[in-house]
Amino acid sequence: MKPYQRQFIKFALSKQVLKFGEFTLKSGRKSPYFFNAGLFNTGRDLALLGRFYAEALVDSGIEFDLLFGPAYKGIPIATTTAVALAEHHDLDLPYCFNRKEAKDHGEGGNLVGSALQGRVMLVDDVITAGTAIRESMEIIQANGATLAGVLISLDRQERGRGEISAIQEVERDYNCKVISIITLKDLIAYLEEKPEMAEHLAAVKAYREEFGV
């Protein structure tokens, strides 16, 4: 685990974005942890979040021309990541996002920001069922652009309805790499460093045994 990944876990815990306990997911599964990126909701939170996304992007080595944030949660993430890349990595790259409803006046269309072209890095909070990615792919392809990769905050590394995860399905269907700031494996490594969190570690490991990929 790299220092920025450890820092991200501490940051997520401090904001209660990452919580341990018993949570029922949309799928009906009972999970020993929950991640709600919507709680990164202040200016400082967003600035820090952008730095973690930028760090993971640079660390991945994937080449891309533009950041795309799917509405709605992806919009602030794409914006803060673009700022962090420019401020901390000297990479001044364009960004763009979609509207859920197309405008029929003014500039029109359903895209805001830079022209959607070239190699696109899609940024979002998490991938649950992959629906937002599929909708975004239609927009990217309709504009003649290509998908360079997908960046999310957390990869839960758990099976979907079948034997593989929603993330593995996206990688297979779109022949792209999905990268994340942290994975379930990183989270377990972090818990292993904290004796006071042994109870949570046991629960998360048991969950991985049952649902992990």
Curated annotation (Swiss-Prot):
<dbReference type="InterPro" id="IPR004467">
    <property type="entry name" value="Or_phspho_trans_dom"/>
</dbReference>
<dbReference type="GO" id="GO:0046132">
    <property type="term" value="P:pyrimidine ribonucleoside biosynthetic process"/>
</dbReference>
<feature type="binding site" description="in other chain">
    <location>
        <begin position="72"/>
        <end position="73"/>
    </location>
    <ligand>
        <name>5-phospho-alpha-D-ribose 1-diphosphate</name>
    </ligand>
</feature>
<feature type="binding site">
    <location>
        <position position="156"/>
    </location>
    <ligand>
        <name>orotate</name>
    </ligand>
</feature>
<dbReference type="Pfam" id="PF00156">
    <property type="entry name" value="Pribosyltran"/>
</dbReference>
<comment type="pathway">
    <text>Pyrimidine metabolism; UMP biosynthesis via de novo pathway; UMP from orotate: step 1/2.</text>
</comment>
<dbReference type="InterPro" id="IPR000836">
    <property type="entry name" value="PRibTrfase_dom"/>
</dbReference>
<dbReference type="InterPro" id="IPR029057">
    <property type="entry name" value="PRTase-like"/>
</dbReference>
<keyword id="KW-0665">Pyrimidine biosynthesis</keyword>
<dbReference type="GO" id="GO:0044205">
    <property type="term" value="P:'de novo' UMP biosynthetic process"/>
</dbReference>
<feature type="binding site" description="in other chain">
    <location>
        <position position="26"/>
    </location>
    <ligand>
        <name>5-phospho-alpha-D-ribose 1-diphosphate</name>
    </ligand>
</feature>
<dbReference type="GO" id="GO:0006207">
    <property type="term" value="P:'de novo' pyrimidine nucleobase biosynthetic process"/>
</dbReference>
<dbReference type="GO" id="GO:0004588">
    <property type="term" value="F:orotate phosphoribosyltransferase activity"/>
</dbReference>
<feature type="binding site">
    <location>
        <begin position="34"/>
        <end position="35"/>
    </location>
    <ligand>
        <name>orotate</name>
    </ligand>
</feature>
<keyword id="KW-0460">Magnesium</keyword>
<feature type="binding site">
    <location>
        <position position="103"/>
    </location>
    <ligand>
        <name>5-phospho-alpha-D-ribose 1-diphosphate</name>
    </ligand>
</feature>
<keyword id="KW-0328">Glycosyltransferase</keyword>
<dbReference type="InterPro" id="IPR023031">
    <property type="entry name" value="OPRT"/>
</dbReference>
<dbReference type="GO" id="GO:0005737">
    <property type="term" value="C:cytoplasm"/>
</dbReference>
<comment type="similarity">
    <text>Belongs to the purine/pyrimidine phosphoribosyltransferase family. PyrE subfamily.</text>
</comment>
<feature type="binding site" description="in other chain">
    <location>
        <begin position="124"/>
        <end position="132"/>
    </location>
    <ligand>
        <name>5-phospho-alpha-D-ribose 1-diphosphate</name>
    </ligand>
</feature>
<dbReference type="GO" id="GO:0000287">
    <property type="term" value="F:magnesium ion binding"/>
</dbReference>
<protein>
    <recommendedName>
        <fullName>Orotate phosphoribosyltransferase</fullName>
        <ecNumber>2.4.2.10</ecNumber>
    </recommendedName>
</protein>
<comment type="function">
    <text>Catalyzes the transfer of a ribosyl phosphate group from 5-phosphoribose 1-diphosphate to orotate, leading to the formation of orotidine monophosphate (OMP).</text>
</comment>
<comment type="subunit">
    <text>Homodimer.</text>
</comment>
<feature type="binding site">
    <location>
        <position position="105"/>
    </location>
    <ligand>
        <name>5-phospho-alpha-D-ribose 1-diphosphate</name>
    </ligand>
</feature>
<keyword id="KW-0808">Transferase</keyword>
<feature type="binding site" description="in other chain">
    <location>
        <position position="100"/>
    </location>
    <ligand>
        <name>5-phospho-alpha-D-ribose 1-diphosphate</name>
    </ligand>
</feature>
<feature type="binding site">
    <location>
        <position position="128"/>
    </location>
    <ligand>
        <name>orotate</name>
    </ligand>
</feature>
<feature type="binding site">
    <location>
        <position position="99"/>
    </location>
    <ligand>
        <name>5-phospho-alpha-D-ribose 1-diphosphate</name>
    </ligand>
</feature>
